[in-house]
């Protein structure tokens, strides 16, 4: 079993969470009790300083770190390490008052007021300067502390800014990308439509809601720029810490399959990837099993950002959250189940937000290990403590690297392009849900599944599943062809390969970029079904399948096997599912959105050829 130990100091699985002692500095009795109860809960790490800027620096240039020295010393003396965050996720009032350009401008061009969090401009030079000051101070004060285990960069990056600084950086970003050739950009974005041709990069604005949002290429590049700009900002923080403390690893906490940032790009400067997991347990829209499988998809997606090592579950709620539409309490045993699921899928940590509930403000009712009751005599605390003991017994799992023979392709570019397209049906495109469904149906067959980018290396996988890969980068088609020629098995679905990286349609038939030859099909039409519409697919070797939402009408090339045909409408009798073999590999095309049972049968058909698993649960 391959291993890579992230934190040898821990000697096992990390167990901890966000701790906010700055909220309790006037209650030394509570701070002392925290140390006692952390030991009782089996915690060996605490995340500090996430939102501590106004405590560190209550007035510009006036710094207070003695309280944090005291806390870190006591934690370390009691066997607990510290993950120390840079506090740039939320700004003190003096900063916004003195430097208003730090505040974001929204998509209508309006400057936001001071308040809440995660609403700072990543481009503002003065903001970057003030962040560099506090980050340097933290490195000076705590870089050599024996209890410092890791740096946590800011918190849950997200959002967009449309201020003049960001507009100028966007224009410069585009000029660099398109070789300072405005005609190259015009061609890539098809700007002659509606007479939107640009004469100079200085004319380009972001997609304001009260401005230009009709150019698909512009909208897509704005999303990419936002990822680039935030990553550039994050790298500036990391550079300071790496110069001062090169031995200390860095991370930041990602959020589910957050649609605002491309984590495949953003993970690159990090040493370890981590994320915050908050499933909607016990909701009335899906089964408990589906909730767990969706969470497993998220774990796999995060894990595969750095497949060669474990990831970190940076935040989870031991009880409930306070921001879901309905904040239902985890039932007994569910916290243990969800935590062990994370470990089984490759996490070397189980961590919480938060250790102790605050008395006021936005997250006063967010779940915590220690409730407002303030004791260790609660169900939640007992479950956390029991889990702490169990994690100690699982210490040998630390460092385990998960290897999967099957991968589902998930691309932020395809997500953004699919969400932003004007076509099909907005309510049923559902790119993320379609990828999750593929993961769920493969997992139901008992196979381990990765979730990777289409631009990653496919070697090591036997089966690649590409659900609705609407945007196909021009080099990916050739890589898919090589994968199949080398014995791999590729499965793609409807709405694959319609546009290139600029969101221009491929010409000559879909799927584009050579995939029509690989699959031996051309999608001539796509029928968008109303929610009440149904069709069926007849299979010779499996039960009839139900079709909802989308059905492509295919032209099938010679040498392509038809596995299923439509039973209704004007395309009755025409191909709905096909397969084409190539040496020892195969390429299956599923032209309609089929029910789960049918998808599992089709996946099983390929898995039987591709994966040597004695424990597969195949229909």
Regions found by a protein language model. Name each.
Residues 201-204, 235, 247, 278-281, ...:
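Carbohydrate-binding surfaces of carbohydrate-active enzymes
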Residues 109-297:
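Polysaccharide-binding and catalytic clefts of secreted carbohydrate-active enzymes
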Residues 24-38, 256-263, 331-339:
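Short, acidic/polar
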Residues 1-45, 397:
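N-terminal carbohydrate-binding accessory modules
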């Amino acid at each position: 079993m391959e291993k890579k130990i992230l934190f040898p100091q821990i000697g096992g699985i990390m167990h901890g969470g966000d701790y906010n002692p700055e909220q309790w500095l006037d209650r030394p009795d509570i701070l002392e009790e925290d140390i006692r109860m952390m030991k009782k809960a089996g915690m060996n790490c605490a995340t500090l300083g996430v939102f501590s800027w106004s405590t560190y620096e209550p007035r510009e240039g006036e710094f207070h770190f003695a309280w944090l020295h005291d806390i870190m010393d006591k934690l370390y003396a009691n066997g607990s390490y510290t993950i120390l965050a840079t506090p740039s996720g939320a700004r003190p009032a003096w900063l916004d008052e003195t430097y208003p350009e730090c505040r974001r401008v929204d998509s209508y061009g309006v400057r936001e007021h001071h308040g809440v969090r995660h609403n700072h401009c990543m481009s503002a030079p003065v903001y970057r300067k003030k962040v560099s000051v506090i980050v340097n101070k933290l490195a000076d004060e705590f870089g050599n502390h024996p209890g410092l285990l890791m740096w946590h960069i800011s918190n849950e990056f997200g959002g967009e800014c449309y201020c003049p600084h960001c507009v100028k950086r966007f224009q410069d970003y585009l000029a660099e990308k398109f070789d300072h050739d405005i005609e190259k950009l015009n061609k890539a974005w098809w700007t002659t439509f509606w007479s939107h041709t640009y004469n100079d990069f200085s004319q380009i604005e972001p997609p304001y809601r009260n401005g230009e949002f009709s150019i698909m290429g512009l909208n897509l590049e704005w999303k990419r720029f936002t990822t680039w700009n935030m990553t550039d900002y994050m790298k500036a923080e990391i550079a300071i810490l790496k110069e001062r403390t090169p031995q200390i690893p860095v991370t930041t906490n990602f959020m589910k399959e957050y649609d605002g940032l491309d984590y495949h790009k953003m993970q690159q400067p990090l040493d370890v990837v981590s994320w915050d997991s908050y499933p909607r347990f016990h909701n009335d829209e899906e089964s408990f099993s589906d909730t767990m499988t969706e969470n497993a998809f998220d774990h796999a997606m995060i894990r595969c950002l750095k497949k060669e090592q474990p990831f970190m579950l940076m935040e989870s709620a031991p009880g409930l959250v306070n921001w879901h539409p309905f904040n239902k309490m985890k039932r007994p045993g569910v916290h243990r189940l969800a935590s062990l699921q994370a470990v089984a899928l490759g996490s070397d940590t189980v961590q919480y937000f938060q250790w102790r509930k605050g008395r006021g403000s936005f997250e006063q009712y967010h779940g915590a290990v220690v409730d407002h009751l303030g004791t260790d005599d609660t169900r939640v605390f007992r479950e956390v403590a029991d889990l702490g003991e169990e994690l100690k017994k699982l210490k040998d799992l630390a460092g385990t690297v998960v290897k999967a023979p099957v991968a589902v392709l998930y691309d932020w570019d395809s997500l953004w392009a699919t969400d932003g397209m004007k076509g099909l049906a907005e309510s049923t495109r559902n790119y993320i849900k379609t990828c999750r469904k593929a993961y769920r149906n493969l997992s139901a067959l008992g196979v381990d599944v990765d979730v990777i980018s289409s631009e990653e290396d496919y070697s090591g996988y036997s089966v690649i599943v590409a659900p609705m890969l609407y945007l196909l980068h021009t080099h990916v088609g050739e890589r898919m062809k090589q994968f199949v020629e080398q014995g791999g098995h590729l499965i793609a679905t409807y709405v694959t390969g319609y546009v290139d990286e600029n969101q221009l349609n491929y010409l000559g038939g879909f799927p584009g970029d050579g995939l029509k030859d690989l699959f031996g099909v051309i999608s001539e039409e796509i029928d968008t079904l109303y929610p009440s519409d149904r069709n069926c697919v007849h299979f010779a070797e499996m039960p009839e399948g139900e079709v909802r939402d989308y059905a492509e009408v295919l032209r099938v090339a010679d040498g392509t096997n038809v596995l299923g045909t439509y039973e209704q409408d004007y395309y009755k009798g025409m191909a709905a599912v096909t397969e084409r073999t190539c040496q020892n590999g195969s390429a299956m095309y599923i032209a309609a959105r089929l029910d789960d049972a049918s998808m599992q049968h089709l996946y099983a058909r390929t898995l039987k050829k591709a994966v040597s698993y004695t424990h597969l649960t195949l229909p």
